[in-house]
Design a protein with these regions (language model features):
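Glycine-rich loop/hinge motif
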Residues: 3, 8-36, 109-117
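Conserved short alpha-helical interface segments
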Residues: 29, 40-46
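Bacterial extracytoplasmic/cell-wall-associated proteins, especially those involved in peptidoglycan
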Residues: 25, 35-37, 48-250
Length: 250
């Protein structure tokens, strides 16, 4: 009898690991696959006002320009959830962890950059997507910062990052068929000047640190070959040569 009674009160839990660099849609898919909550519920919750008590989310002041308000703040880590958990509770665990990771020391460093937390998280998310490894993160960061600072003068005001082109999707093939041919992302850094409206994924602590403390370089261009080797350039002409070396241009 005791055994039967103990089962009445047992609630099934599940551990889920979210790798670095997932976007909100991928977080939602993982939650559904693990029986935490449905993908649809998570995506609906991601744009609700339920997270406005978090300072990080409160600071987002352009939510109408974003696809998902919580993008960038769902910290990659391993979490324990209840099966069929409320989606707001589930997402809150990830946001709360992000809040903890962005401690006073890190927030003070961000303040010293003269940028907002959200701008740094946006840069970090692009670094996460565009970099081959940790060392590369700091150089990619320097290139993004150099373009943001000098772009108007030297014609590099557009960040021109492939990872932003189809956001909130990864690739054109992920865009729903009905809008695939005409889809234009508001985050496409080939089209817009400066930073996109917000983060494009949920970056790691390393990417955030790289966004805060870029290497000191005078590069404005980068590319990678299929093996992840990085090529950096100061001028458009050098970049064209690098694209050929990397097998990305004729």
């Amino acid at each position: 009898i005791n055994h039967l009674q103990s089962n009445v009160y047992r609630v099934d839990t599940v551990k889920v690991t979210f790798p670095e660099g997932l976007n909100v849609m991928e977080v939602a898919q993982l939650m559904e696959e693990n029986g935490v909550c449905s993908e649809e519920e998570v995506l609906e919750a991601a744009n609700s006002d339920e997270f406005d008590g978090f300072d990080l989310i409160d600071a987002v002041d352009n939510e109408t320009e974003r696809y998902y308000k919580v993008e960038g703040y769902l910290f990659p880590d391993t979490y324990e959830f209840y099966k069929s958990e409320d989606p707001v509770d589930a997402l809150s665990k990830l946001i709360r962890n992000c809040d903890r990771k962005l401690d006073e020391d890190l927030l003070a460093q961000i303040e010293e950059t003269g940028m907002t937390v959200d701008e740094i998280m946006t840069i970090a998310s692009i670094i996460q997507e565009e970099s081959a490894d940790e060392e590369d993160m700091y150089i990619v960061s320097s290139i993004l910062h150099n373009r943001l600072r000098d772009g108007a003068e030297n014609g590099t005001a557009q960040l021109g990052c492939d990872s932003t082109v189809y956001y909130p999707y990864r690739t054109q093939s992920e865009v729903p068929e009905s809008e695939r041919e005409t889809f234009k992302s508001r985050y496409n850094t080939y089209e817009i000047i400066g930073l996109p409206p917000g983060p494009i994924c949920n970056p790691s602590l390393k990417a955030i640190e790289a966004a805060i403390s870029p290497s000191d370089t005078d590069y404005y261009y980068f590319c990678h070959d299929k093996d992840g080797n990085a090529y950096y350039a100061k001028t458009a002409q050098q970049h064209q040569q690098n694209l050929k070396k990397a097998g990305l241009a004729e």
